[in-house]
Amino acid sequence: MKPKVLLGCPVYDGKDYIIERFIDRIKNLTYENYDILLVDNSKTNDFAKKIKSLGINVVKLKWDENSKKRLVISRNYIRDYVLENGYDYFFSLECDLVPPRDIIEKLLAHKKKVVGGWYYICAIPYIRPCLAREWTLVNMQFAFKEELFEKMAKTKLMKVLQGSFGCCIIHRDILEQIRFKTYITMPHPEDTWFYLDCEKKGIEVYVDTDLLIPHFQDYKWDELVKKNKIEDLKQMKHKEDEFKYEVVDIN
């Protein structure tokens, strides 16, 4: 039997502009043994109700004012769901990316525990791939190196230090070792800390450079993150008991 895969994604109502196109694609992937779970962290229940009306399995979690907390809480709900329901892989796919219909087969074909596609993100002052081969920090941000493109051109399956959760498949063995986290006082998102934990544990991470995924990015989320960066400085660092999820009934 083919590995059992859960396609999971945190969502919120700021992605309403793309959600129907995203759902149309994920409902029609060619892989034979996958399920879908979207976890809504919007402030109201309206977006979750819309997703449910489109025939998608959705869970609504209690709102938290901090956007970084919302993401980690949502992603850990998905992680726990994978482990508790016998899935072999968590396919993390962000809802503003539209992958090819055979994306799961292409990722599984590499037989790696952590492997993803890639996409461009808008990061002032340049547009760059959302991945890194080495940890190079400038002003507490990961710095982009232009020679990355040369490496990508020469290597189909490239070993990296950091991919992203935008399009990545993770084996349950890895999820059993690593719980998603963030540090409120730091600017980096939870996927950065996941890949740092992979490095610490000697877990290899790969990106298929052939799998460039269209990314329909907006900037509402960027503004939320900027707002939270200011607020985060007033708060304490990551504490596991501050990141518990609570399911909300949308019926």
Residue ranges and their predicted role:
Residues 86-98:
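Short beta-strand-to-loop acidic/aromatic patch adjacent to the donor-nucleotide binding site
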Residues 157, 162-164, 172-173, 177-251:
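C-terminal catalytic/acceptor-binding lobe
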Residues 33-43, 60-63:
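Short beta-strand/loop segment that forms part of the nucleotide-sugar
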Residues 4-8, 35, 193:
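Cell-envelope/extracellular polymer assembly enzymes that use nucleotide-activated donors
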Residues 23-34:
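Short, acidic, metal-binding catalytic loop of nucleotide-sugar glycosyltransferases
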Residues 11-20, 40:
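A structural helix-start
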Residues 100-182:
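Conserved catalytic core of nucleotide-sugar-dependent glycosyltransferases
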Residues 46-87:
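Active-site-proximal specificity loops/subdomain of glycosyltransferases
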